[in-house]
Regions:
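Divalent metal-dependent hydrolysis catalytic cores, especially in the metallo-beta-lactamase
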Residues: 1-29, 43-55, 82-93, 108-109, ...
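Electropositive phosphate-/nucleotide-binding environments in soluble metabolic enzymes
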Residues: 20-23, 27, 68-72, 93-97, ...
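Short, electropositive alpha-helical surface patch
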Residues: 26-39, 100-109, 247-252
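Alpha-helical scaffold segments in soluble metabolic enzymes
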Residues: 28, 32, 77, 102, ...
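Active-site core of metal-dependent hydrolases
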Residues: 75-200
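His/Asp/Glu-enriched, well-ordered alpha-helical/loop segment
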Residues: 149-163, 168, 180-192, 197-283
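Glycine-centered positions in the ABC transporter ATPase nucleotide-binding domain
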Residues: 295-296
C-alpha cells in the first residue's frame, strides 16, 4: 500500500492524495480511505483532496477539464468521510461566499492551492476558516510590491500553516529559508508531494495518459514541467538541514508535529506523549534513518 511504502522511509502516518478527477472517482477514493481506516490499516489518517476546485491559470499537471464549481452537492460529497481527517485544497477565488465556512463546519481542513487569489481574497477565506497553503510558492499568485498575492498572505499570516516541497527544485533555497524564518518550525509543514516512483525501481509512471519521469528528488513531464516529487519526508529534512541550514530539532518538528497540528491531530500523532500513537524513528549521528516504529512495532 501507499502507507507501507512511505513507512519504510520514516513517514508513519499520512493522507493519501487524490488530484482533480470526476466526482464519481472522488466518491470511490473516499470510500476506499474510509474502509482502510475502519480496517485499521497502519498510517492512514484520512484523505487529501487536491482539486478539482482549482484555478485553470494555476493548474500545474492537473487536468483542467476535471475542474468544477464548488456547489452544495460537492460540499456534501467532500465531507462524506466518516473516519479520519479530510484535507481539501482549493482555489479560494473560485469558491462561492460561505462555501469554505461550510466545509470547515462539516469538519474539513481547507488549504489554498493552485490559486490566483489576491491577498484580499485570501484574507476573506481565512475569515471563513482557511487554515493554510498546500505548496507555498508553487502554483499560486506571487508576492509583488503592490499585490502581495497568495505568497504574501501566507508569509504574513500569524496563524496559518504552509506546506513546503523541500526538494531543492520546487522552491529556491533562499525562499525555503524565508519560509522557515518567518513561519518557524511550528507552522512550516514539510510535505513530500511524492509520486508512485518513491520506493520503486521504476523511474517513471503514467498520469492521465502522460509519462512522468523521476529525476533525483523531483518528477517532471516530458516537457520539463514540474509534476510532483520523488521525495520522502526524511529526504526533505536532509535538504532543509544541508541547504537551508536549519537544525535537526527544527527539521524534525517540520516533518512531524507541524503537519499534525496543521490537520488538527497534534494529540494523536507527531510527538511522543502519553496517549499518542507510538510512531517514531531512530536516526544515527549523521541523521540517517536507522529504524522505524509504527504503533509500537518495529518495521
Amino acid at each position: 500500500t501507499i502507507a507501507r511504502a512511505h513507512a519504510k522511509f520514516g513517514t508513519t502516518a499520512l493522507l493519501p492524495t487524490l488530484i482533480s478527477d470526476d466526482l464519481e472517482k472522488i466518491a470511490l477514493a473516499i470510500e476506499a480511505v474510509d474502509a482502510a481506516i475502519e480496517a485499521e490499516v497502519p498510517g492512514v489518517l484520512g484523505i487529501h483532496l487536491e482539486g478539482p476546485f482549482l484555478n485553470t491559470s494555476r493548474k500545474g499537471v492537473h487536468d483542467a477539464s476535471k475542474f468544477k464549481v464548488l456547489d452544495q452537492e460537492a460540499i456534501e460529497l467532500l465531507t462524506r468521510l466518516k473516519r479520519g481527517k479530510t484535507l481539501i485544497t482549493l482555489a479560494p477565488e473560485t469558491a462561492p461566499p460561505g462555501a469554505i465556512a461550510e466545509l470547515v463546519r462539516r469538519g474539513a481542513v481547507v488549504f489554498a492551492g493552485h490559486t490566483e487569489a489576491s491577498y484580499e481574497q485570501i484574507i476573506a477565506a481565512e475569515a471563513e476558516g482557511l487554515r493554510g497553503f498546500t505548496h507555498i510558492f508553487n502554483a499560486m499568485s506571487q508576492l509583488s510590491s503592490r499585490a502581495p498575492g497568495v505568497v504574501g498572505a501566507a508569509l504574513s499570516s500569524p496563524t496559518s500553516f504552509s506546506g513546503l516541497i523541500a526538494d531543492g527544485v520546487h522552491v529556491h533555497v533562499a525562499n525555503m529559508a524565508l519560509v522557515a524564518r518567518l513561519l518557524g518550525p511550528k507552522r512550516t509543514v514539510l510535505v513530500s508531494d511524492a509520486m508512485p516512483t518513491l520506493g520503486s525501481d521504476q523511474d517513471w509512471f503514467e498520469l492521465k495518459g502522460e509519462k512522468i519521469f523521476a529525476r533525483g528528488l523531483t518528477c517532471y513531464t516530458p516537457d520539463g514541467v514540474l509534476a510532483g516529487s520523488n521525495l520522502s519526508l526524511h529526504d526533505a529534512m536532509g535538504v532543509m538541514m544541508r541547504q537551508v541550514g536549519i537544525g535537526l530539532t527544527d527539521a524534525l518538528q517540520m516533518a512531524s508535529h507541524a503537519p499534525a497540528r496543521a490537520i488538527g491531530l497534534e494529540g494523536q500523532v507527531g510527538r511522543l506523549a502519553v496517549g499518542a500513537r507510538a510512531d517514531f524513528v531512530q536516526l544515527d549521528g549523521d541523521s540517517n534513518l536507522v529504524r522505524v516504529w509504527q504503533r509500537g512495532v518495529q518495521l
